[in-house]
């Protein structure tokens, strides 16, 4: 019985130290940066409530990643020599819609929460696969009667 209690105690202590390490691992480094395959964004938030802290951090990261996508898509859209002012405006609206739609598919790849002085601070990193975002943008453009005739897909893909 003594051995059983000792083993349970030892398992508890080792489990707690592993849990503490997992909770204090920073969400930094190249593994959490945007690369050729993924758009990634990080954010931090603080609140008196742990859930509110996480929600605020995810919302801030979502905003950051949608801004990245918009900037990349607008830069790639400059490759479209056939777009006039009306098409640019329509394209911008389409990008806005696609980024909102894709932001619903965010994946949290790192989350770190800690508490100090009665407040919770949460760091998160979210990601979206670039290939999926590009595919959604292209499919939306191809489904638009006005834009599909002017759209130069290969130039857009190369610039994206």
Identify the function of each model-found stretch.
Residues 22-160:
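Domain-level marker for long, solvent-exposed, non-transmembrane regions
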Residues 7-17:
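Bacterial N-terminal signal peptides
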Residues 1-5:
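Positively charged n-region of N-terminal signal peptides that target proteins for export
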């Amino acid at each position: 019985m003594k051995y059983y209690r000792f083993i349970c105690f030892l398992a508890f202590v080792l489990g707690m130290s592993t849990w503490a390490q997992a909770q204090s691992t920073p969400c930094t480094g190249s593994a959490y940066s945007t690369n050729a395959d993924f758009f990634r964004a990080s954010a931090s938030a603080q609140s008196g409530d742990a859930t509110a802290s996480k929600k605020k951090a995810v919302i801030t990261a979502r905003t950051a990643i949608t801004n990245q996508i918009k900037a990349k898509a607008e830069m790639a859209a400059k490759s479209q020599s056939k777009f006039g002012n009306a098409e640019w405006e329509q394209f911008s609206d389409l990008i806005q819609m696609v980024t909102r739609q894709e932001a619903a598919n965010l994946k949290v790849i790192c989350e770190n929460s800690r508490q100090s002085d009665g407040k919770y601070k949460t760091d998160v990193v979210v990601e979206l696969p670039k290939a999926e975002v590009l595919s959604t943008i292209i499919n939306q453009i191809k489904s638009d009667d006005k834009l599909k005739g002017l759209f130069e897909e290969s130039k857009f893909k190369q610039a994206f």
